[in-house]
Each structure stands twice: as structure tokens, then as C-alpha cells.
Amino acid sequence: MTEIQKPYDLKGRSLLKESDFTKAEFEGLIDFAITLKEYKKNGIKHHYLSGKNIALLFEKNSTRTRAAFTVASIDLGAHPEFLGKNDIQLGKKESVEDTAKVLGRMFDGIEFRGFSQQAVEDLAKFSGVPVWNGLTDDWHPTQMLADFMTIKENFGYLEGINLTYVGDGRNNIAHSLMVAGAMLGVNVRICTPKSLNPKEAYVDIAKEKASQYGGSVMITDNIAEAVENTDAIYTDVWVSMGEESEFEQRINLLKDYQVNQQMFDLTGKDSTIFLHCLPAFHDTNTLYGQEIYEKYGLAEMEVTDQIFRSEHSKVFDQAENRMHTIKAVMAATLGS
């Protein structure tokens, strides 16, 4: 029988943004997640968090994040408690500080998915327990662990990988890919119209990490330059939650940046993989997709159905890996 290893040790730490961790710590979490994935595949129990209680705070809805934290908690022997936007009063009827102090006395760890980065920072500051950022408008660190785990599973390494993000350069995925990638020695290319370039503050953090750890950061609106010899092409939705009024403007800006076969041909290699944090608008098989088609005549948006369903696509491995990497973070910061 396989011997259960002790959890990777980051006891008491919070994961609020990628730069909270060193390269070695981030890689350690990825490797630990790969081990936990094998445990689950082989039916090996790994109850590192028996008796623990986990609060799952959701201001923003999510399929993958909620499912991943819930299953990860149960697999680790913990009890997850979901608190949706109608259950919590962060900054409305009760301050984040007061909420944090209450939850910290009842729960052993807190996940937060919402809008404000300051909110998740304050939860960590005042709760006295580990807090994990499930997504804010600024950063998406748990997604990054899954993304780079997926890349490592496909190529066997991270340092020196070329990763191209195509789309809105101002969103949290672009921010996090730049910083996490640079920290892991990855060459990150953000391909976006100039008007959607990431803010300099985020680029500066990424470039600092690149100089420290050996990665690189490129910001360009030239698609051919961005995807040449790239190992992975990553995209995200063109319009995020709360931005629905900007659909027409965003479509006009990004229609030439759709991930399609022509873009993959420009890579010059057959081994390039496709990544997407999901949900993806690649067909009209949703009410949302039908509405976009009726309004704008687009049956596909950020990625074509051909690429989404192709052998290049690793999006469902990536989605599964949310659970394994979140499990690694929880076990590392709470386990003993």
C-alpha cells in the first residue's frame, strides 16, 4: 500500500495573491497536488483535515470554484459550509473586520470569492485563520496553480515554457498569469489590443518576478509575434461578470483575437495546448450563447468550437486540477 506523505507544510499561511509565495513554495504546491491527484485516482484516503470546518464565502457565483473547494474539503476529511451573497453582509450590514473575527472563531479556514482584493486581505488580517482567494477583480491564485499544474502534466516542466494569453489584458487572469508565470520561470506573452493593455503596476510586479526567477513578460498587440513557437495559448471570456453592457465594444476590440485554427497554425508547432478557465463561449448551446448570436451574429466568441473540442484543448484537465490544487493549498496551510 502507498504510504501517505505528510502534507506540504505552509501551516498558518494564507493564499491571497501569487506573490505571497516564493517560486519554491508555488512549485511545491503544484507537486503536492500531483501527488494528491494520484491518491484520489488510486482510492488512497488522505484525511489531512479531519475535524476541520471550512467557510466558503461567495459574493460571485461559480461552478468550478465552489465544486472544487467542496469536494476538496470532503476528500480531506473537513466539513465545508457554503455562505452565498445572500448569507453574508461583508461591508453592508457588518464590516469585513467584524465578519472576519466572527468566522475566525467558528471556522478553521476561509475561502473568499468576490470583487474586492481588500476584502480578502482584511479577512486574512482579522480572522486569525488561513484565507484562500477563490477570485477577486485583481487576482486568481487558485486558478494559477491549476493552470501551471496542467502545463507541467503536459510538458513535464515549467521553466522555459512559452505561454501566450490572448484577450483582455486588464482582467485578473492576465494579471495572475504574468506574475505566477514570471515567478515560475515561464515566458509569458500578453496579446491584447493596446487599449486593453494591463496596468503598469501589474506589469511591474511581473517584470520584477521575471528578473528574480528567470521568466519574461511581453505585452503586444501582434498576434503572430505573440504565438510564434508558443507552448500554450490561453484565453478567457471577453466580458466578465458585471460588464455585460460592454459586449458590443469588447467584441469590436477583440474579434480579431479569437483563438482559432489560423492562430494555432501561426505557432509553427503541433504540440501547443489550449487553456481556458471556463466557462467558454464556443457555441450557441446556452441561453447566453443564443442571446449573443441573436444580438451580434457570433456563434463563437473567444475560441472556436473546433479548437475547444480539439486534441489541443486541455480545458477539462485544467478544470479537474482546480480541485487537486485547492486540496493541496488547504492541506498545506491547515494540515498537520
From Swiss-Prot:
Superkingdom as given in the UniProt entry:
Bacteria
EC number(s) in its UniProt entry?
Answer: 2.1.3.3
So what does this thing catalyse?
carbamoyl phosphate + L-ornithine = L-citrulline + phosphate + H(+)
An individual GO BP term: citrulline biosynthetic process
> Which keywords does this Swiss-Prot/TrEMBL entry list?
Arginine metabolism, Cytoplasm, Transferase
Q: What class of enzyme is it?
A: transferase
Cell compartment(s), UniProt: Cytoplasm
The family database entries (Pfam families) matched by this protein are listed as: OTCace, OTCace_N
PANTHER family documented for this protein: ORNITHINE CARBAMOYLTRANSFERASE, CATABOLIC (PTHR45753:SF1), ORNITHINE CARBAMOYLTRANSFERASE, MITOCHONDRIAL (PTHR45753)
User: Per its record, how is this protein called by name?
Assistant: Ornithine carbamoyltransferase, catabolic
Identify the species of origin: Staphylococcus aureus (strain COL)
Q: Which gene encodes it?
A: arcB
